[in-house]
Regions:
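Rossmann-like NAD(P)-binding element
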Residues: 4-62, 70-85
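Short secondary-structure capping/turn micro-motifs that flank functional sites
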Residues: 19-21, 86, 137, 180-181
Length: 181
């Protein structure tokens, strides 16, 4: 529904997974890690010689022994990974701006993977592109999200709450000072 509201037209510019993969020369796999694993059997048959498989995160390829995502040898496997949340990326795109992105080439079967990757990075509005690998992107993304965004912030908030409680603040006061301020 969101795609249609944004002007995509079913059967003209909007397709189901199989039809999109069949028609496309660059198959963009922009799904959650769990979703990539579940749709991989659907996508793989359409990855014919010369196509490119594009990711925005290195997880599925880095741990392909666990995800089962093993691309055919005769396709390019590329990545442009915006350094921000999907919500931020979408908001900035609608404003005509972009986020910095890392890029990587896992497999260059056509000899054109670099050109495709840089063009896609520019096309999505990346303000700055810097080279990485799928493995480094996956590791830095997971440690950044799980360590800094989830773990560190939560730990700081908990520590502040506990210090306030230890110093005589009521639970309500400690909570509000921690969360509301």
């Amino acid at each position: 529904d969101k795609a249609v509201a944004d002007g995509w037209v079913p059967g003209e510019t909007l397709f189901g997974i199989e039809e999109a993969c069949e028609k496309g020369t660059i198959v963009m796999c922009l799904l959650s890690d769990a979703a990539v694993m579940s749709v991989w059997p659907t996508i793989k048959p359409y990855l014919t010689a010369g196509k490119a498989l594009y990711f925005s995160h290195g997880f599925a390829i880095t741990w392909n022994d666990r995800t089962g995502v093993v691309p055919p040898a005769d396709i390019d496997v590329i990545m442009v990974a915006p350094k921000g949340s999907g919500t931020s990326l979408r908001t900035m795109f609608l404003e005509g701006r972009g986020l910095n992105s890392s890029y990587a080439i896992y497999q260059d079967a056509t000899g054109k993977a670099y050109e495709k990757t840089i063009a896609l990075g520019i096309g999505i509005g990346s303000g700055y592109l810097f080279e990485t690998t799928f493995q480094r992107e996956a590791t830095s993304d997971l440690t950044g999200e799980r360590g800094s965004l989830m773990g560190a912030i939560q730990g700081l908030l908990l520590a502040q709450y506990e210090v306030l409680r230890e110093n005589g603040h009521t639970p309500s006061e400690a909570f509000n000072e921690t969360v509301e301020e």
